[in-house]
């Protein structure tokens, strides 16, 4: 008897599993609140050089600015330069000193802003870009983008640590570590007195949040039977969507970056308390030989699900026999993901897919400008469009399979980026439609990737595998903000890069084995029973098959 038979006895889907999904909803909501926070936290409002001595009379200010600030090619006043000397304007007396000295030129000299900047605070009262003494604009705008890169680099490192440690010490313990660390480091970030302190604490916060990304989904799936994995996986992913829409509301209500950071961090406190009711994975406990604790959780699951318990089939001795077949005699390592042919094939393909999913998703999600809507409306729209994409994923993975769904959603993302290259920047409505379509496809790709990857790896290496894919995915997420700086080389280069990577990931997804209707593999041997697929026809994972 294997674990699937044990789970069938205690109930593979019922009040126990639904309570588990509900208790683990908070981490899924908190993730977008932090991951997409730079949309508001690092927003750059309209700004110009500070010009001491500006006239108090409002009617004269336009003339004053015209005399002191050069214009960009699009006709707007420069945000980063000012004239070395005030310029004489027709029908004005400004700049008469230079005119009397005969210093007027066709192209007057300009210099960088030397006395700081003045910001338009109508939309944001404070961001890290406008923070006093930081001024992350113009020559320092790279540091503003780098803040997001530092954060995702932290997520990358955290994914390695949490993936390995949760396979060794358990999902529940490491989830507690993630909660406490996020709370402490989030509060420290909000209290930052310098950019260096902010960058360090946000990097460490990203490392802590990585625990949520790779622990929550497997902890849910390992208590579910095959039939209900899809619906539960899609349901739990809707909490991410809820977090995106909540971020738009919180960002609209709180315009100061420090208070905003506090608002998205403090919910970790009730999350810590909720872990009292979150069960450890019985699958993991059995692979580690913790029979008594696994037996206790299985009995609790049976009681909540209203299942009669058979003393013979669910006795501690019976569970011990299952554990004997599941127990891991050696601690897992990342090298185990590449030791055997089929697992190596899966791992390499997942690396490419996850990099493409994250790179394109965050490239699109963090760019909310140029769509004809304000930042709050765009964020709300991006969140709302994810709901129908969840329905698309639910139907597609059930009937078309995981592999084709993964490839198709990534292809849709790539086409959305490519089509936007053909649309003029003046066509705001079309740009908005294409961006929303791309967001829907990229979110669908993200949802599918979590479900698909969790089903590909065996229980003994599931967290390690999720840690590897999360690591590479966050590498893609950390590079996405920096790729946006490529617009300095060619305006269309960022979109071309995002779309090209998504297209590569779509092709790679077709090389993965199908997992629809397959039970979760328990051991490496379960995965290795069949060679890697070589055709696009549907191939099920080589485990026991169940019918929909």
From Swiss-Prot:
Keyword annotations of the record: Cell membrane, Ion transport, Membrane, Transmembrane, Transmembrane helix, Transport
Subcellular location: Basolateral cell membrane; Apical cell membrane; Cell membrane
Assigned protein family: Belongs to the major facilitator (TC 2.A.1) superfamily. Organic cation transporter (TC 2.A.1.19) family.
GO biological process per UniProt: alpha-ketoglutarate transport; monoatomic ion transport; prostaglandin transport
Transmembrane portions of the chain: 21-41, 146-166, 180-200, 204-224, 234-254, 259-279, 346-366, 376-397, 404-423, 432-452, 466-486, 493-513
Transcription regulation keyword on record: no
GO molecular function, one term: transmembrane transporter activity
Designated name of the protein: Solute carrier family 22 member 7
Reactions performed catalytically: orotate(out) + L-glutamate(in) = orotate(in) + L-glutamate(out); 3',5'-cyclic GMP(in) = 3',5'-cyclic GMP(out); GMP(in) = GMP(out); 2'-deoxyguanosine(in) = 2'-deoxyguanosine(out)
Gene3D superfamilies to which the protein is assigned, alphabetical: MFS general substrate transporter like domains
Function as written in the Swiss-Prot or TrEMBL entry: Functions as a Na(+)-independent bidirectional multispecific transporter. Contributes to the renal and hepatic elimination of endogenous organic compounds from the systemic circulation into the urine and bile, respectively. Capable of transporting a wide range of purine and pyrimidine nucleobases, nucleosides and nucleotides, with cGMP, 2'deoxyguanosine and GMP being the preferred substrates.
InterPro entries: MFS, MFS_dom, MFS_trans_sf, Orgcat_transp/SVOP
Principal localisation: membrane
Listed GO CC annotations: apical plasma membrane; basal plasma membrane; basolateral plasma membrane; plasma membrane
Topology term for the membrane: Multi-pass membrane protein
Region Disordered: start-end pairs: 522-548
Domain of life: Eukaryota
């Amino acid at each position: 008897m294997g674990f699937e038979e044990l789970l069938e006895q205690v109930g593979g889907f019922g009040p126990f599993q639904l309570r588990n999904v509900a208790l683990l909803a908070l981490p899924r909501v908190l993730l977008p609140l932090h991951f997409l926070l730079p949309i508001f936290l690092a927003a750059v409002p309209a700004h110009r050089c500070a010009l001491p001595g500006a006239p108090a009379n409002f009617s004269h200010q336009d003339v004053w600015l015209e005399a002191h600030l050069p214009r960009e090619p699009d006709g707007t006043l420069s945000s980063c330069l000012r004239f070395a000397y005030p310029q004489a304007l027709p029908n004005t007396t400004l700049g008469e000193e230079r005119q009397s000295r005969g210093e007027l030129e066709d192209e007057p000299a300009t210099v960088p802003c030397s006395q700081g900047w003045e910001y338009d605070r109508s939309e944001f009262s404070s961001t890290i870009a406008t923070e006093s003494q930081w001024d992350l604009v113009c020559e320092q705008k790279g540091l503003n983008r780098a803040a997001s890169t530092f954060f995702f680099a932290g997520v990358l490192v955290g994914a390695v640590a949490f993936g390995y440690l949760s396979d060794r010490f358990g999902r529940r313990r490491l989830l507690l570590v993630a909660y406490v660390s996020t709370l402490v480091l989030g509060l420290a970030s909000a209290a930052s007195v310098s950019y260096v302190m902010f960058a360090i604490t946000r990097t460490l916060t990203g490392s802590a949040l990585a625990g949520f990304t790779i622990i929550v989904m497997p902890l849910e799936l390992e208590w579910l039977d095959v039939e209900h994995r899809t619906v539960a996986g899609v349901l739990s992913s809707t909490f991410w969507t809820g977090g995106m829409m909540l971020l738009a509301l919180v960002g609209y209500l709180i315009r100061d970056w420090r208070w905003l950071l506090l608002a998205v961090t403090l919910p970790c406190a009730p999350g810590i308390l909720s872990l009292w009711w979150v069960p450890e994975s019985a699958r993991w406990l059995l692979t580690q030989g913790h029979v008594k604790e696994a037996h206790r959780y299985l009995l609790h699951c049976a009681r909540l699900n209203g299942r009669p318990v058979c003393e013979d089939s669910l006795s501690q001795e019976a569970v011990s026999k299952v554990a004997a077949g599941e127990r891991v005699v050696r601690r897992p390592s990342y090298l185990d993901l590449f030791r055997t042919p089929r697992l190596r094939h899966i791992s390499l393909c997942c690396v490419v897919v996850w990099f493409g999913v994250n790179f394109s998703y965050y490239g699109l999600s963090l760019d909310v400008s140029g769509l004809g809507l304000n930042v709050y409306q765009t964020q709300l729209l991006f969140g709302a469009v994810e709901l129908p994409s969840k329905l698309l994923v639910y139907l597609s993975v059930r009937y078309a399979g995981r592999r084709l769904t993964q490839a198709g959603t990534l292809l849709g993302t790539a086409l959305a980026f490519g089509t936007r290259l053909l649309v003029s920047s003046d066509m705001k409505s079309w740009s908005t439609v294409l961006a929303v379509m791309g967001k829907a496809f990229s979110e669908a790709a993200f949802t599918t990737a979590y479900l698909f990857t969790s089903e590909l790896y065996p229980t003994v290496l599931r967290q390690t595998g999720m840690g590897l894919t999360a690591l590479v995915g966050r590498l893609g997420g950390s590079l996405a903000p920096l790729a946006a700086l490529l617009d300095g080389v060619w305006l269309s280069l960022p979109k071309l890069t995002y779309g090209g990577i998504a297209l590569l990931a779509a092709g790679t997804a077709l090389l993965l084995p199908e997992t629809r209707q397959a039970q979760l593999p328990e051991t490496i041997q379960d995965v290795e029973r069949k060679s890697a697929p070589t055709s696009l026809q549907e191939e099920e994972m080589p485990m026991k098959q169940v019918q929909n």
